[in-house]
């Protein structure tokens, strides 16, 4: 009975390690890396992320935009 328990514990440990590796591999999947850059053309203080996002997408043709604590518009682009 003790041998059977040890074998089952080893199988369970291997099973857990396999799924841990599988989970971590998903986290580092094949996605394009994104970089956050200060907008070149946004004028004035950035008070609403909706305006910044619209500007980055439609005017600078980038992925998205967000206002940060420095009241400037930052755009996301692929690196």
From Swiss-Prot:
Belongs to the DEFL family. Not glycosylated. Has 4 disulfide bonds. This is Defensin 2. Residues 1-32 form the signal peptide. SUPFAM superfamilies: Scorpion toxin-like (SSF57095). Keywords: Allergen, Antimicrobial, Defensin, Disulfide bond, Fungicide, Signal. InterPro entries: Defensin_plant, Scorpion_toxin-like, Scorpion_toxin-like_sf. May form dimers. GO terms for biological process: defense response to fungus; killing of cells of another organism. It holds the Pfam family Gamma-thionin. Probably has antifungal activity. Disulfide bonds join 35-79, 46-67, 52-73. It comes from the Eukaryota.
């Amino acid at each position: 009975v003790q041998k059977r328990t040890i074998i089952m514990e080893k199988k369970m440990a291997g099973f857990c390690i396999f799924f841990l590796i599988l989970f971590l591999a998903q986290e580092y999947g094949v996605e394009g890396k994104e970089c956050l850059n200060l907008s070149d053309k946004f004028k004035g203080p950035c008070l609403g992320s909706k305006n910044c996002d619209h500007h980055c997408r439609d005017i600078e043709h980038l992925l998205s935009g967000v206002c940060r604590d420095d009241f400037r518009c930052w755009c996301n682009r692929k690196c």
